[in-house]
Amino acid sequence: MTKWKRANPNGTRDYLFEECTLIEEVEQKLRLTFLERGYEEIRTPTIEFYDVFAFQNRPIDEEKMYKFFDEKGRIIVLRPDMTIPLARVIGTQRWDTPLKVTYSGNVFRANESHSGKYNEIVQSGIEVIGIDNVRAEIECVISVIQALQKLKVQSFTIEIGQVQLYKCIVKKLSIQDEEERVLRTYIESKNYAALSNFIGEKKLDRCDETVRLLEKLPRLFGNLEVIEEAEKLASSNEMKMAIARVKEMYETIEMLGYGSYISIDLGMIQHLDYYTGVIFKGYIYEIGEEIVSGGRYDELIGNFGEMLPAVGLAVQVNQIVKALQEQQEPYERNQIDIVIHYELNRLAEAERLRNLLRKDGKNAWLSLFSNLSDTFQFARKNKIGTVVEAKNEYLVEYVWNEKWVVQKEGEASCVTFKLR
């Protein structure tokens, strides 16, 4: 029964010191940026009923959920997604729209062993509810660009795609569910050879505009030239409108001065099936890992109540932390300036001194050792140059100068003066 007591479950890990501090800083800066832009916070439980995620099309694979039972035998899951619980909250209550909400929390997905993915990650995100025009998508992209700028993330890009265009192609070519799932992997992975073979095996007419658009789809990434290519092959009004929405987004964001942070990828298809229109993915060049994901999901909230249009995105906090660790100077833990050693009956004075020193910008630390020599040893080990001893009715200040020497004592001590 104790075989695994020293190990972590697959896909999880411990976070220590530097990473904990950075995770907290990233979450807080994201939160403040989103609050400044008018978003309001929502928090949902870490555990949800399985039924919350078990609606039509099953946007999240059942095998990826951590499932267990509550006291009444009902199936409970650790939330594998943040957007669906938010949709539950919005759909089951009456709201004045539009709504702009923000959140932060852990999500849990059981990825395959050795996949290199963590099963527990931290996400912070935003959602714009009740608006079906392109202003909502633009608001989300601008918000996340500004947030990443404040975090001083270097060399990032937000890719803009359009899942509606892909769905129009699939529908027009009558590609069924199983085939569609295979096709999706070819396009997302930009596997040109496999896609060409798929078209050949399906005996699709390569002269047909829609087939030509399908075959080109993985190659349609870059700037506005991509839009021009897609427009030439769009064979229905629905396709043209889907492409026009991406064009309008790109031009508006570029006009605002954020053009260097965005690009277009019409071959991008989100793995979550609830997206219905424009989608986003963000990357950092040096890492290659996804740091932002999201899009429009106009049909999701209707699973829980009133049908409301919505768009949102999530920032992968763990990946941001990884990027900051690689891009910035090595992190140094908060350096202790002074250790205060005290006799137990002088704790009140020691605590008061610590507070006074902190007000002066000094990081003062109360010693946990009862023996002064142990305090000296701790200070040397941690490169702390000053020890103050609170003893009887007076204070003694020691500094390290090849050995511990008395710097000031009694009434002459600067720290004694602060206490008076």
Curated annotation (Swiss-Prot):
Name of the protein: ATP phosphoribosyltransferase regulatory subunit
Family membership: Belongs to the class-II aminoacyl-tRNA synthetase family. HisZ subfamily.
HAMAP family the record matches: HisZ (MF_00125)
Described function: Required for the first step of histidine biosynthesis. May allow the feedback regulation of ATP phosphoribosyltransferase activity by histidine.
GO biological process, any: histidyl-tRNA aminoacylation
Keywords: Amino-acid biosynthesis, Cytoplasm, Histidine biosynthesis
SUPFAM superfamilies, per the entry: Class II aaRS and biotin synthetases
A single GO cellular-component term on record: cytoplasm
Highest taxon in the source lineage: Bacteria
Compartment(s): Cytoplasm
Alphabetical list of PROSITE patterns matching this protein: AA_TRNA_LIGASE_II
InterPro entries the UniProt entry points to: aa-tRNA-synth_II (IPR006195), aa-tRNA-synth_II/BPL/LPL (IPR045864), HisRS-like_core (IPR041715), HisRS/HisZ (IPR004516), HisZ (IPR004517)
Coiled coil: none
Extra remark beyond the main annotation: This function is generally fulfilled by the C-terminal part of HisG, which is missing in some bacteria such as this one.
Species classification: Bacteria, Bacillati, Bacillota, Bacilli, Bacillales
UniProt pathway annotation: Amino-acid biosynthesis; L-histidine biosynthesis; L-histidine from 5-phospho-alpha-D-ribose 1-diphosphate: step 1/9
Quaternary structure annotation from Swiss-Prot or TrEMBL: Heteromultimer composed of HisG and HisZ subunits.
Main location: cytoplasm
GO MF term list: catalytic activity, acting on a protein; histidine-tRNA ligase activity; transferase activity
